[in-house]
Amino acid sequence: MGFFKETGNLIKSLSGNLDARVDQGLWFLKNGQNENAMNCFSSASLKGHPNATRLWGERLIDDGIGHIDTLGGLMKLKKAITIGCPAAEKSYSSYKNRSQVLD
């Protein structure tokens, strides 16, 4: 039964249903497919889904690919902080405490 439920989510997410896209990403995450999960979260985030933005930010930081050495990475991190990602706040604090960062 789980296979058919996930197939239904896949079809809904491909048709543009953002909640289904997030659910599909969570399914990928649960099954160890981080890259596919990030793709789901990022696409839903870019279309304005707030939970997807939080999940995407957490994945970027937890997987260590949310580099903040670039302006784009810093903006993603600040967006994750804005929507309440505790891992993002910790990462930003360590970034701010580096000696080469100037306010």
Model-derived regions: residue spans:
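TPR-adjacent "capping" and linker segments in tetratricopeptide-repeat scaffold/adaptor proteins
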Residues: G2-D19
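Short helix-capping/linker turns of helical repeat alpha-solenoids
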Residues: G16-N17, K47-P50, D62-G64, I83-C85, ...
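Hydrophobic face of amphipathic alpha-helices that form TPR/SEL1-like repeat modules
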Residues: D23, W27-F28, L55-D62, S94-R98
